């Protein structure tokens, strides 16, 4: 086990940073050192922003997005098309699509995908609320913006069957989403093209 290079408070900071996606122990040490060097300009404001976020973040009961209000900012936006619902696996996918600027509809976050390997079944996902939202009279289209993985496509097929009795068109993202690809890692142009060229599922 590597020897501690600083007091327990700094070591704890490094350990917590190392848990972040994309940060290993080395990167976490560099990030911690940068935060410490810029304590007033970076560390203190970051700590305050994290404290406030921890206290105020809620999950939107309408769509499953995270925000500091319920309903969330997107659900409260009356300029969005209420007749189209974009279904995503996770909030990170919602954020990725928002960055593309191609979506003017509303979202629905499933909170995962069906996975026999991970034991994720339909009752573990936000599916009953999806059926409720897709059943409203003004709903015309449900866009399945799910990752092009085996589990993502299995979930897409399940949702298509789940909504088959409703008078809504079910579509999926088109060109630009590679097989095995995840939305959060795609650039805005690719996502924008995928939304515009969606096809019936």
UniProtKB/Swiss-Prot annotation:
Protein family (similarity comment): Belongs to the RecR family.
UniProt-recorded name of the protein: Recombination protein RecR
Coiled coil: none
Gene name in the database record: recR
GO BP, sorted A to Z: DNA recombination; DNA repair
Species, as recorded: Methylobacterium nodulans (strain LMG 21967 / CNCM I-2342 / ORS 2060)
InterPro entries on file: DNA_Rcmb_RecR, Rcmb_RecR, Rcmb_RecR_Znf, TOPRIM_dom, TOPRIM_RecR
Pfam families in alphabetical order: RecR_C, RecR_HhH, RecR_ZnF, Toprim_4
CDD domains: TOPRIM_recR
C4-type zinc finger segments: 60-75
GO MF annotations in UniProt: DNA binding; zinc ion binding
Keywords: DNA damage, DNA recombination, DNA repair, Metal-binding, Zinc, Zinc-finger
PANTHER family: RECOMBINATION PROTEIN RECR
Job description of the protein: May play a role in DNA repair. It seems to be involved in an RecBC-independent recombinational process of DNA repair. It may act with RecF and RecO.
């Amino acid at each position: 086990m590597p020897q501690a290079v600083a007091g327990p408070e700094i070591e704890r900071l490094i350990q917590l940073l190392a848990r972040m996606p994309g940060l290993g122990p080395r990167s976490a040490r560099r990030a911690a050192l940068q935060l410490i060097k810029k304590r007033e300009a970076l560390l203190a404001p970051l700590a305050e922003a994290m404290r406030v976020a921890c206290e105020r973040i809620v999950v939107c009961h309408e769509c499953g997005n995270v925000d500091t209000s319920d309903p969330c900012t997107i659900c409260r936006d009356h300029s969005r098309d209420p007749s189209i619902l974009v279904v995503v696996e996770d909030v990170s996918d919602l954020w990725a699509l928002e960055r593309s600027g191609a979506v003017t509809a509303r979202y629905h976050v499933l909170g995962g995908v069906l996975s026999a390997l991970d034991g994720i079944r339909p009752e573990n996902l936000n599916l009953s609320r999806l059926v409720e939202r897709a059943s409203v009279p003004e709903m015309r289209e449900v866009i399945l913006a799910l990752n092009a993985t085996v589990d993502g496509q299995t979930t897409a097929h399940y949702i298509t069957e789940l909504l088959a009795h409703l008078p809504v068109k079910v579509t999926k993202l088109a060109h630009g989403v590679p097989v095995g690809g995840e939305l959060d890692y795609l650039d805005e142009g690719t996502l924008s093209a995928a939304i515009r060229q969606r096809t019936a599922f």
